[in-house]
Amino acid sequence: MRRALVLILVLICTLPALSQAKRPFTFEDMMALKRVGEPVPSPDGKWVLFSAVDVDLAADKKTPHVWIVPLASETQGPSTALGMTGERMIIADQDADRPRWSPDGKRFAFISTKENGSQVWIADVDSAAGAVTGVRRLTDIKSGAGGELWSPDGKNILFTSDVYPGCDNSPADEAACNAKRLEEWKESKVKALLFDRLLYRHWNAYKEGKRSHIFVVPVEVKTPTLPNTGAGWGTLVSEARDLTPGDYDAPVFSLGGQDDYALSSDGQELCYASNHDKVEAISTNNDLWIVPVNWDANAKPADVLAKTKNITVDNPASDSNPLYSPDGKWIAYRAQQRPGDESDRFRLMILDRATGEKRNLAQPMDDWINWFTWTPDSSEIFFVATDAEARNRGQTTIWSTTVAPNMSAPKNLHSGERALAVISMKRITRGYDDDLVFTREGRAILFTRMSLEHPSQIQRLVLPARLDPSDLPQGEQLTHLNDSVLSQIAMSPLESFWFEGAYGDKVQGFLVKPPNFDAGKKYPVKFLIHGGPEGAWGDDWSYRWNPELFAANGYVVIMINFHGSTGYGQKFIDAINDDWGGAPFEDLMKGLDYAEKTYPFIDKDRECALGASYGGYAINWILGHTDRFKCLVSHDGMFNSTSAWGTTEELWFNDWEFKGTPYTNRDSYDKWSPHLYATKFKTPTLVIHGQLDYRLDVSEGFQLFTTLQRLGVPSKMLYFPDEGHWVLKPQNSQLWYRTVNGWVDQWTGVR
């Protein structure tokens, strides 16, 4: 009897633990997660809009929807004051992305492909209930519309569209011309393209003679006086005005960051980034241009161009991401200083609109400035960046800096910059944060936060009167769309370690343990190598190379931020220049050596290395320089440096990294080309490449696979005819993970 009672008590105690047992992460779990976008607070301070992408694995489809969540007053606690708790999808019967509130808060614009391709739609909102009362399509442009932006008075919306520059004329003529050319292309049996300059394709698509332009259209559309031309613009045929005519992209394709165009606070001026250099493929000289927004009906493209002005003509490197101050006095933007170097440090600049004077506001920071926003009173800019403290945790955090340059002070003779009247930089958060924006009252910020164990969620932080750097507030989590799924999953936190790498520098590595980790066991290793090469591993979430998913079936995952990685200062980034297989390779090997010696649970006889982009190059380099790994996975990597130069679209990158072209600096291209070390290839290798990869052409993968097969090295190639540099389609991604993990399991003996 006593034994029975004891058994019952044991069961009672253990059942809760059993019911709460978490399981390893699976690909299906990852596809069940909703992908939360940036927060968009309402002007009345009651609501936050955001988009979230749902993945239907069976249908091989990703669909964005618009959601809403209540936002309490900045003096209240958790956001439950309006009678609604948690998030609610408010546009469910069509795809809907990029929500943007109107200035009066009575409606919002969004992008949808429900009818006639990508178009701008308007949703009317009951602000008291946070409910949509109706939707209508605003644009009906054959070339599609995206990137919508409200004018401050709510009367106009700007949007972008890829159009034929030769069609520049009156709005009606331009609409008809574009529609006619698009229809001719669609109906023609001939799909040949004739090129007469470089940058004829980019990323994963051919440009087909089109340019991105910015248009403005009234929200309350009047009946056109001209007859319907059948051009496909419907009631907008005489209304949409091209503000950036000409044979240039406006905005230019981005080197990173937020929107590359913005409206002044009075709605009278547009600022956008565009590159007007003769050979775009070798230039990073994106400049900021300004143009008036309002034009009469008789204005011609030549009139618009005559009023367009380059305000950063003095900088031969990239200027991008303009953002006007709320008081209209300043334009903040990001700038680089070295022409042709896409990995030069992004600086936070401001331009005085009255005088044209420019100033670096975050000069003390030796790191990239990422997303930024103004305070409502225009006194400060909040931005995202990394410093030594954040770097140690693998994070990027939110900072603030005052806007108080002394424009009357003399310029420094060497830097050309003026002294600051006051400079005050403060850390605001600790986390991997991004997408920040202020609420109406200016005392709270909204932002997204992620970690290795959690995809993006929206946070709200009420700013205290005084910040304690040792105890920064975490804020309130507003979105909980993924909590249910994640509560069932066993994940491991990111662990950091440091070791002595190339040049005696301290180099950082990270480690992720498998679920249900047992320190007394030995575990095989997946050694991940990041791309860029100017990128970095950190405490962030990824759907394409997810360390938690790689660890889930019993592996220790190790990642090294080798020389060239971001977050450790510009000198550390620059160290990879013309040294692709030098210091980075040394760091990778020393980092793995350190991990093997430090962590007794690592089985150094069962290690595989995996990498994509530059990581793929590193794998190809490893093939010819060490046989320590049981297997390798090379995804979209450079194999032949000369052919990679001739087939990439962004030629400035190779020109900078290898200090010239193959015909001006052949020694560098030969020295760092993996294909010239093929006689040493021995390690079993899985090659992966996409047909639509124009950054590193698919021929690089074919050359590698051909070489491996000719040498008799065990190898396979996974070829995606419908993917580019990244594998994005859900079922393709499923196949990618299954093939990669299966290959590694095969050679490490995991069953």
Segments and roles (model prediction):
Residues 1-16, 72-88, 127-130, 223-238, ...:
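Intrinsic disorder/low-complexity segments
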Residues 40, 158-160, 187, 191-196, ...:
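Non-catalytic accessory segments flanking enzyme active sites
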Residues 43-44, 103-104, 152-153, 265-266, ...:
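Residue-level detector of Asp-centered blade-edge/turn motifs that repeat once per structural unit
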Residues 45-48, 108, 157, 270, ...:
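Hydrophobic beta-strand positions that form the internal "hydrophobic ladder"
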Residues 52-65, 89-97, 109-121, 129, ...:
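A flexible loop/linker signature enriched in serine peptidases of the S9 family
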Residues 521-531:
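Short beta-strand element of the alpha/beta-hydrolase
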Residues 528, 546, 551-552, 559-751:
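Active-site-proximal cap/loop segments of hydrolase catalytic domains
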